[in-house]
Curated annotation (Swiss-Prot):
Belongs to the G-protein coupled receptor 1 family. Muscarinic acetylcholine receptor subfamily. CHRM5 sub-subfamily. Residues 1-29, 88-104, 170-191, 465-478 are extracellular. Residues 282-291 have a biased composition (Polar residues). This is Muscarinic acetylcholine receptor M5. It comes from Homo sapiens (Human).
């Protein structure tokens, strides 16, 4: 590809022309070209370095999909550092001034990196296609190790195809035919050979990727329709099952006699925290006895909602809380009780990690304002009885204070068996998988679209030059090949636009919040989703 543009740029009717430095451009043109290309090169380098650092510091991005994007970022970084700047220098000076060895090394690096980008896009397309069409058989084999092998093969094939031929062709034929002031691939001096490489390196891969993406799109749309039909049939019985389901879900470790309406109105309170608060309801607990000082609960189950697809991708781990029970007596070990024996309604306030700095949660015995939809989460907590005679309410019920337990926790509580509607859970899981598949397909479509837009003009000129050698001006050759480089600039932008986790990680890195722990904790408590 590149050799043909160099050939047209530095020869006239096949005869080499020696140019003086910068004689082909005016001063303002040199300044403009140098400034624009320097900015594009800088954006390319910064964008792809951000992709690599984001992958390193944020474990949420360490998915199989993103291993391929990391490989693509490596190829784009090579182009941003070496290819863009050396090619711009070559254009401005009108000749190659670094010698034949540097020329061959640069061409080998440039072609290997460019071809590796194409191969990585092919691998991503096949990975998405098999993930959609063979979810049971392919996904079991879809591991980081397998992804690493595929990435290694993509780079190895690119290296074998280009590097030996570029570096060793002159030794195979016995002489170097490229002039000293030019830089081009010796075996691409014939337009027909250049045409063949364009077909193999661009048109065939683009055709394959387009076909695969069309099939991915059709399969995704089909699954969306099937899921909509499934949700429609499930909604028929949803209203009938709602009340029993609520009663079954609202279980925890405390129980006391149901208060009257007046008592509930009197005792109603709400969760409060340093940042956010939500209403809480409950059937207050009968104290285990004046002498009981503390009791360890097996689980405290709470319910909230799945309002959107983003919530399904939030981390499943929830804060572990400590309940301080205010009553008479002092703190000391007491008896245990389990969820099967007791019943109470709780609603969890969504809190960020910073809420732990000033914990002040109050759980009231009120029983009003339940949430509309449900997401079951389990907590371990500690119940501590403190001397406070004023805290006791009617019917022996008490106010409790929720405080964070010290980390780490050895074992997370299980929430199995809490949902009484398995078909609803199955539908919800299918929706989560479908949302992730659609996000991955969107990222792939953006990358493919950018690749086709930036690489097509140059490869069209290659086809034209095969039949009409002088029909393509030198300036268009330069612009066309530079546009291929711009694809490396656009790719990180596509990742950020299509993936919220990438976008937020980029922002935090640019704001110099680069420490791994801070980045992961911030993204965790903001509920960012993983990359498909």
């Amino acid at each position: 590809m590149e050799g043909d543009s160099y050939h047209n740029a530095t020869t006239v009717n096949g005869t080499p022309v020696n140019h003086q430095p910068l004689e082909r451009h005016r001063l303002w043109e040199v300044i403009t070209i140098a400034a624009v290309t320097a900015v594009v090169s800088l954006i390319t380098i910064v964008g792809n370095v951000l992709v690599m650092i984001s992958f390193k510091v944020n474990s949420q991005l360490k998915t199989v999909n993103n291993y391929y994007l990391l490989s693509l970022a490596c190829a784009d970084l090579i182009i941003g550092i070496f290819s863009m700047n050396l090619y711009t220098t070559y254009i401005l000076m009108g000749r190659w001034a670094l010698g034949s060895l540097a020329c061959d090394l640069w061409l080998a690096l440039d072609y290997v990196a460019s071809n590796a980008s194409v191969m990585n896009l092919l691998v991503i397309s096949f990975d998405r296609y098999f993930s959609i069409t063979r979810p049971l058989t392919y996904r079991a084999k879809r591991t980081p190790k397998r992804a690493g092998i595929m990435i290694g093969l993509a780079w190895l094939i690119s290296f074998i195809l280009w590097a030996p031929a570029i570096l060793c062709w002159q030794y195979l034929v016995g002489k170097r035919t490229v002039p000293l002031d030019e830089c081009q691939i010796q075996f691409l001096s014939e337009p027909t050979i250049t045409f063949g490489t364009a077909i193999a390196a661009f048109y065939i891969p683009v055709s394959v990727m387009t076909i695969l993406y069309c099939r991915i799109y059709r399969e995704t749309e089909k699954r969306t329709k099937d899921l909509a039909d499934l949700q429609g049939s499930d909604s028929v019985t949803k209203a009938e099952k709602r009340k029993p389901a609520h009663r079954a879900l609202f279980r925890s470790c405390l129980r006391c006699p149901r208060p009257t309406l007046a008592q509930r109105e009197r005792n109603q309170a709400s969760w409060s925290s340093s940042r956010r608060s939500t209403s809480t309801t409950g059937k207050p607990s009968q104290a285990t006895g004046p002498s009981a000082n503390w009791a360890k609960a097996e689980q405290l189950t709470t319910c909230s909602s799945y309002p959107s697809s983003e919530d399904e991708d939030k981390p499943a781990t929830d804060p572990v809380l400590q309940v301080v029970y205010k009553s008479q007596g002092k703190e000391s070990p007491g008896e245990e009780f389990s969820a099967e024996e007791t019943e109470e309604t709780f609603v969890k306030a969504e809190t960020e990690k910073s809420d732990y700095d000033t914990p002040n949660y109050l759980l009231s015995p009120a029983a009003a304002h339940r949430p509309k939809s449900q997401k079951c989460v389990a907590y371990k907590f500690r119940l501590v009885v403190k001397a406070d005679g004023n805290q006791e309410t009617n019917n022996g019920c008490h106010k409790v204070k929720i405080m964070p337990c010290p980390f780490p926790v050895a074992k997370e509580p299980s929430t199995k068996g809490l949902n009484p509607n398995p078909s609803h859970q199955m539908t919800k899981r299918k929706r989560v998988v479908l949302v992730k598949e659609r996000k991955a397909a969107q990222t792939l479509s953006a990358i493919l679209l950018a690749f086709i837009i930036t690489w097509t003009p140059y490869n069209i000129m290659v086809l034209v030059s095969t039949f009409c050698d002088k029909c393509v001006p030198v300036t268009l050759w330069h612009l066309g090949y530079w546009l291929c480089y711009v694809n490396s600039t656009v790719n990180p932008i596509c990742y950020a636009l299509c993936n919220r986790t990438f976008r937020k990680t980029f922002k935090m890195l640019l704001l110099c919040r680069w420490k791994k722990k801070k980045v992961e904790e911030k993204l965790y408590w903001q509920g960012n989703s993983k990359l498909p």
